Regions:
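Conserved HGGG/HGGXW glycine-rich cap/lid loop of the alpha/beta-hydrolase fold
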Residues: 14-73, 78
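Active-site loop/oxyanion-hole signature of alpha/beta-hydrolase fold enzymes
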Residues: 48, 52, 62-108, 282
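Flexible "cap/lid" loop of the alpha/beta hydrolase fold
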Residues: 118, 125-164, 646
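Conserved alpha/beta-hydrolase catalytic His-Asp/Glu region
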Residues: 139, 163-220
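Short beta-strand/loop motif that positions the catalytic acidic residue
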Residues: 230-231, 237-239
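Conserved nucleotide-sugar phosphate-binding/catalytic loop shared by glycosyltransferases and other
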Residues: 318, 345, 349-400
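A nucleotide-sugar donor-handling region in carbohydrate enzymes
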Residues: 458-562, 592-594
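Donor-nucleotide binding loops and adjacent catalytic segments primarily
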Residues: 507, 525-624, 676
Length: 716
């Protein structure tokens, strides 16, 4: 997320780089939220999962602490004393024009917030202390290893040592320390982030910063217990029971000394903002609301309780919130069909959609109701497009790296279901909602139906050992979620049949995907976007794009995202070769809603169009098609009995494994590699062969939408 304002605060010759978000929020009498830096081993990027959700409602300030990020790096331990770092907080408040602030600190930053609040009670409205690392005389196993003592080994906390950092293996310490910070299972993404944020950390500077914090090397260190007793503002302490950096007893002592409120996170580690972002963001919001003037706080007084079911709807029509995955258009097409069938069964239901582009384009063409909250969603399609190379998308890694967007969009959802009452939520591959509801089951106060057409993150056949470990770990987390919190989903619907599910294992030592899905899902059969028999005049459709009697029409489409541009260009390059092989061939290139047709070169016998809301009609009116490899487009062609050439995205595990399995069930096995499709003569040969070999597909069921609606209607 980009800041609204940036600048520097200068104090004692040290410049501190700050950023401000949500600048339009808050009145002059309202405090800002300041997300404090922490130990100089990382910069302020570790707040990435807090900034977006909080900045929608509050003014939020972050800054790189001295010695990190874009701020200056003074030398010597005295420059990094707790008093210096605490004084930096006030300097940033002054530079940003902030009279009062709620301070949110992680680890050693809690000490700085305590000193700032004790010295400037008029400036600090409240403190949220996360995993505090204060210098209390509390027994800790790590204390047997002295930071400035002799180097004692390569393992564990023995690596928290000045000599080890400067003369041995600083990287080994980073890997150990961030592993301890992120001690919860399934924290691979968080560990990667912290290692990345620490990549440019200078061990000599970190020695200075650590000695300054500990009062070594001539740095002054005040009595922190005395400073805690001097704090007058409200203090909330949150600490995990599995914190391996500082034990829970440190947080309990801080709460005792400040008269603060203690929040214990069962199983929580040290890096709670990264591993428990929904909980931390809710706590920050609650602390902020308590610090607001009465007139401002009144706006949130009617918020519902944090857990439990709401009261009955008292005679009003049942309300449904529908979420449809925005990665492509296939989900939207089938979800509209399901919604239509659901209304046929329950005409009284009111359906709102929480949706973003390109799903919103489909919904508008069907006159569906898009909830205004949709405008705050961050674009998942744009992220996927930035992750894509030339017809190359590591779909698993792209989803992993979308964590900031997914958390933001879940926050939109959470605020919506907190402010409005919905009886049922339907999530079609709404990954963020399913994941974070399992992480925060107390937020569920509605019935939840989960839809998907594939189950299981799978490594590509040529995957590295690391990818195999990660996919298995993500699958294991999902299985644990489902085992522990079965009540989160009231109905799991697989959009397909049992034979469509891959036979692979979730990972080494994990169950068979096919067996597990059959035990945990209901099956709707495939859901077509619209019944093919609705096409009454294919000749008219063909004529719209220049087809004359005797012409053959090849429809070229790459789905609803913008990742198909490379394939479209390769197809256009091959048009002369294809016409040479099939002289009466014409082309309709459908670029979709996220690729501008004008960006492609005009080509003889080729018509181009962007988004076609009734694409299925043109697919059924075609003679052959060239497609990217997404499930919906391929299955619509199978349902229409049309030959096609599919070119799956490289490294896209769903298209290359799950979709291929599905198509094989209908007798549509086989595809063209992109390297082959990029050779005009090979693509022309594939199209010519497809035209001369009429396909023999297994018939596709047409009642999938009705079956899915029937399964869902039971929840209303």
């Amino acid at each position: 997320m980009l800041p609204d304002r940036t600048g520097t605060a200068a104090r004692a010759g040290v410049r501190l780089a700050w950023s401000e978000f949500g600048s339009t929020h808050g009145r002059a009498d309202q405090p800002a939220i300041v997300l404090l830096p922490t130990w100089q081993i990382v910069d302020s990027r570790f707040w990435k999962l807090q900034i977006g959700p909080l900045a929608r409602h509050f003014r939020v300030i972050t800054y790189d602490g001295r010695g990190s990020g874009s701020s200056d790096r003074p030398s010597g331990p005295a420059a990094y004393s707790n008093a210096e770092c605490a004084a930096d907080i006030i300097a940033v408040l002054d530079a940003t024009g902030t009279d009062r602030a709620v301070l949110v600190g992680l680890s050693c930053a809690v000490t700085w917030s305590v000193i700032a609040a004790a010295d400037h009670p008029d400036r600090i409205a409240a403190i949220l202390a996360i995993s505090p690392s204060c210098g209390f005389p509390v027994a800790q196993p790590r204390d047997k290893h002295a930071f400035d003592g002799p180097y004692a080994g390569h393992q564990g906390w023995a690596t928290y040592n000045k000599t080890f950092w400067l003369q041995k293996d600083f990287r080994a310490f980073q890997e150990f320390f961030f592993g301890e910070m992120n001690s919860e299972p399934h924290s691979s993404r968080q560990l990667e982030d912290f290692l990345d944020w620490s990549a440019d950390c200078d061990p000599a500077l970190l020695v200075d910063a650590t000695e300054g914090r500990l009062g070594l090397g001539g740095a002054a260190c005040s009595d922190i217990e005395l400073r805690c007793r001097q704090v007058r503002c409200p203090v909330t302490v949150v600490h995990g029971t599995d914190d391996r950096v500082r034990p829970l007893s440190v947080g309990e002592r801080l709460a005792e000394l400040t008269g603060g409120t203690m929040v214990v996170v069962p199983g929580g580690g040290h890096a709670l903002p990264a591993r428990q972002p929904v909980l931390i963001n809710r706590l920050i919001r609650d602390v902020m609301h308590a610090a607001l003037p009465v007139s401002a706080a009144g706006a949130v007084a009617d918020r519902p309780p944090a857990g439990g079911r709401r009261s009955s709807r008292a005679g009003r029509p049942p309300k449904i919130l529908f979420l449809s995955s925005p990665i492509g258009l296939g989900h939207a097409q089938r979800d509209v069909a399901i919604a239509t069938a659901l209304r046929g069964r329950r005409p009284d239901v009111q359906i709102d959609w929480l949706a973003q582009h390109p799903v919103s384009a489909v919904l508008r063409s069907h006159h569906e109701r898009i909830h205004p909250a949709s405008g705050a969603l961050l674009s998942e399609s744009r992220h996927i497009e930035t992750e894509c190379g030339e017809h190359d998308l590591d779909a698993f890694e792209a989803i992993r790296r979308m964590d900031e967007i997914l958390l933001n969009n879940f926050s939109i959802f959470a605020e919506l279901i907190e402010s409005e009452q919905f009886d049922l939520v339907i999530g079609d591959e709404a990954w963020e909602v399913d994941h974070f509801l399992h992480e925060n089951p107390d937020l569920k106060r509605f019935r939840f139906a989960w839809l998907t057409d594939f189950v299981g993150w799978l490594p590509m056949p040529d995957a590295s050992d690391r990818e195999r470990e990660l996919t298995a770990d993500y699958n294991a987390e999902m299985l644990e979620h489902r085992s522990k919190f079965q009540a989160v989903r009231d109905r799991s619907v697989f959009v397909g049949n049992p034979g469509d599910v891959v036979p692979d294992l979730f990972g080494p030592g994990l169950p068979s995907i096919n067996s597990w899905v059959q035990e945990n899902f209901a099956f709707s059969g495939y859901v077509t976007g619209a019944p093919v028999p609705g096409i009454t005049d294919p000749a008219s459709l063909r004529a719209c794009w220049g087809c004359e009697d005797g012409d053959l029409l090849c429809v070229v489409t790459v789905g609803g995202s913008g990742v198909g541009g490379a394939l479209l260009r390769r197809v256009l390059d091959a048009v002369p070769a294809m016409i040479n092989r099939v002289p009466n061939l014409r082309f309709l290139v459908v670029t979709g809603p996220r690729i501008d047709p004008a960006a492609l070169p005009p080509t003889h016998r080729v018509s181009m169009v962007g988004y076609l809301p009734d694409l299925h009609r043109y697919l059924a009116a075609s003679d052959v098609a060239i497609v990217q490899g997404g499930l919906t487009t391929c299955m619509e062609l199978v349902a229409a009995g049309k030959p096609f050439v599919s070119v799956p995205l490289r490294r896209h595990f769903e298209q290359n494994i799950h979709v291929r399995r599905r198509l094989a069930q209908y007798g549509a096995a086989g595809s063209l590699r992109y390297e082959e499709a990029a050779v005009p003569d090979l693509l022309a040969e594939a199209v010519g062969t497809a035209l001369t070999r009429p396909p023999v597909y297994r018939s596709v069921e047409t009642d999938g939408a009705e079956r899915a609606a029937g399964l869902i209607a039971e929840l209303v």
